Amino acid sequence: MSKQVRVRFAPSPTGALHIGGVRTALFNYLFAKKHNGVFYLRIEDTDQNRFVPGAEKYILEALKWLGISPDETIGKNEKFGPYRQSERKHLYKQYADLLINSGWAYYAFDTSESLDTLRKITEAAGNTFIYNHTVRETLDNSLTNSPEKVAERIANGEDYVIRFKTPVNETLHLKDIIRGDIKFETNLLDDKVLFKSDGMPTYHLANIVDDHLMETSHVIRGEEWLPSMPLHVLLYRAFGWEAPEFAHLPLILKPVGNGKLSKRDGEKLGFPVFPLQWKTNEGTSLGYKENGFFPETVINFLAMLGWNDGTQQEIFSLEELVQKFDLNRIHKAGAKFDPEKNKWFNHQYLVKKEDSTLAELFLPILASKGIVTNLDYTTKVVALVKERAHFVNELWDLSDYFFIAPTSYDEKATKNWKEETPELMKQLIVVLNGIEDFTSLNIETIVKDWMTQNEIGMGKVMQPFRLSLVGKMMGPHLFDIIEMIGKKETINRIEKAIATL
């Protein structure tokens, strides 16, 4: 690309970062890294009424956990700082005044009460009230007041807003990287408020000013901002600035039904919609981290929501995503969220991890259950059972018999315990006692030779043998279990089963 790529993630600190916002951040990050550009984070906190303490810190921590921290943000490489809009508000009034002076904006003194009244009258007549070119020259603003009167009212401290003066009778031909050519009729647009009576800019003005001053090359954001695109392009024209390129991402859709994924969907169907835990007065919402997902899992499944590389490949490292990412391969249609597929992704990453790494994550779970063990033994256990796990916290249910003897036996499996079983198990104990080299392959060879020589059917021994050691008909290769728990423990468990069953 001819100019340096600079892209931003610009959330509002109004609560926990939703998974849809995380995907927007991810796609910006991938695009920046693909083109050796800069990914920066800007906090858009102009709406102080919706500001939530702790939300800004949460956003930064979530991006850090996911491994997609910004190159520039608050307190980090502040080349174009400040990166909080509330600390830049002195700038916005200057630019609002520029628009006033160039005729692209005007002061409006209409009270909310007068506009509400006008809105009700219009709706009663079966129409929709829009503050635009059809009514602006009949309302209380600087287009209908003399310059002297306007100056007097402002000097007297009267409340006002600054509205954009949308051009009339124009068709805007705009281009979106994902959606292609788009047309907008300016006559259908309203005169948006750019500067509020509280002295703060609206999103539209602050966004355009900051994107220009921070040299943003591409705006990659959710499709909910597509209706704002014509206003934003017109603002660039009004200022005489070159507009960035735009790419509006498809929605993340509900797993069932129609519409955009929401926090309520997660609560109803039992899956997280936040990257990290979020606490409010109403309660605590666990995030993907607390639910046992690896950060690379979240990155991977979010990347596949609305994008693919044109192949059948589904598992991508962050480095591979950077290499293959292309905005032109993002779909226009919304992407359905699939909680079960996300678990599959986590399983793929779990089985790829080093056994010792998983063991280190598993040890605190074992300690919480009063199990005293070591990393070496736990690593061997993990190697035998991880293929069946989606999450680290599932390892206990898959491997508890490696650490404690069964306290009960699966009722269905006890049907394999026949009248002759106790005698066969006693003979098996004798065989096991005679084995010196107590390793999996050697134990298996000797036990199977004994069964063959005595013409004992495999099922008559192996099923009750597994039931004695595990308590159920599951688990890895039986002789691997035997080697792990050792001769003494193996025999003790068989004797307990004989006495119990």
Curated annotation (Swiss-Prot):
Residues that bind ATP: K263
InterPro entries associated with the record: aa-tRNA-synth_I_cd-bd, aa-tRNA-synth_I_codon-bd_sub2, aa-tRNA-synth_I_CS, aa_tRNA-synth_I_cd-bd_sf, Glu-tRNA-ligase_bac/mito, Glu/Gln-tRNA-synth, Glu/Gln-tRNA-synth_Ib_cat-dom, GluQ/Sye
A Pfam family reported for this protein in Swiss-Prot or TrEMBL: Anticodon_2
Endpoints of the signal sequence: none
Intervals of motif 'HIGH' region: 11-21
Subcellular compartments: Cytoplasm
GO cellular component term, pick one: cytosol
Disulfide bonds: none
Gene Ontology terms for molecular function: ATP binding; glutamate-tRNA ligase activity; tRNA binding; zinc ion binding
Free-text function comment from the UniProt entry: Catalyzes the attachment of glutamate to tRNA(Glu) in a two-step reaction: glutamate is first activated by ATP to form Glu-AMP and then transferred to the acceptor end of tRNA(Glu).
Name by which UniProt lists this protein: Glutamate--tRNA ligase
